[in-house]
């Protein structure tokens, strides 16, 4: 590994501060290597509402690092499959979704500018969103599309989870029928199984891949 990969000597001015960017971690599957830089961590924090970014805390930086390691593992797997680049409409829709989590679009742009982007239309920012969309598509294909929820699954969840939880929260209220809550139950079961499969995938991917922390945050 070259010295450039360990510490990049790019100095950027952000919010009147001078920050030396550096490679925090590498993730490799033996064929390809993904880098995670300090800027990547700050960019991730900028996308999270109510998280301080100037200066960021060590706790938040490490939380962002764990998330980005997972994303890099997904990206390495996604690159094995043929895919079309996200469209401009998909990128715009994803940006609008992220903006909706903030008090205003102005507040979101202020956070982007604080970590070095010019606006939501900054090509570098759009490239990050494009990569996130590609990962989302991979997850939908790899996990969600193969999940089957049977009638027996629905009935068991309704009996063992939905009814006890409904009674706990709504004392004295008539319990809705399974039929009336079937869509909700299928969605909840699907999300549970997706989460379980993703957790299993990440555990296995981390055993196969090599994650090296070069500069602790």
Regions found by a protein language model. Give the residues of each.
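Periplasmic POTRA and POTRA-like interaction domains that precede
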Residues: 17, 21-49
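Peptidyl-prolyl cis-trans isomerase
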Residues: 16-26, 30, 55-217
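Sec/Tat signal peptide C-region and signal peptidase I cleavage site
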Residues: 11-15
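Bacterial N-terminal signal peptides
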Residues: 1-10
């Amino acid at each position: 590994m070259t010295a450039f990969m360990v510490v990049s000597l790019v100095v950027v001015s952000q919010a009147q501060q001078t920050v030396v960017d550096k490679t925090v971690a590498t993730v490799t599957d033996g064929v390809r290597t993904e880098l995670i830089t300090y800027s990547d961590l700050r960019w991730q924090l900028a996308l999270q509402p109510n998280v301080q970014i100037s200066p960021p805390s060590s706790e938040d930086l490490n939380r962002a690092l764990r998330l980005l390691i997972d994303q890099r593992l997904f990206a390495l797997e996604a690159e094995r499959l043929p895919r079309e680049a996200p469209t401009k409409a998909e990128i715009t829709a994803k940006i609008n979704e992220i903006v909706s989590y903030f008090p205003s679009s102005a507040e979101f742009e202020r956070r982007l500018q604080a970590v070095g982007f010019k606006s939501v239309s900054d090509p570098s920012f759009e490239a990050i969103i494009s990569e996130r969309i590609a990962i989302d598509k991979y997850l939908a294909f790899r996990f969600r599309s193969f999940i089957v929820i049977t009638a027996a699954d629905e009935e068991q969840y309704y009996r063992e989870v939905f009814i006890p939880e409904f009674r706990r929260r709504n004392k004295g209220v008539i319990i809705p029928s399974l039929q009336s809550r079937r869509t909700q139950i299928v969605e909840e079961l699907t999300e549970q199984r997706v989460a379980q499969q993703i957790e299993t995938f990440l555990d296995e991917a981390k055993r196969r891949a090599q994650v090296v922390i070069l500069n602790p945050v």
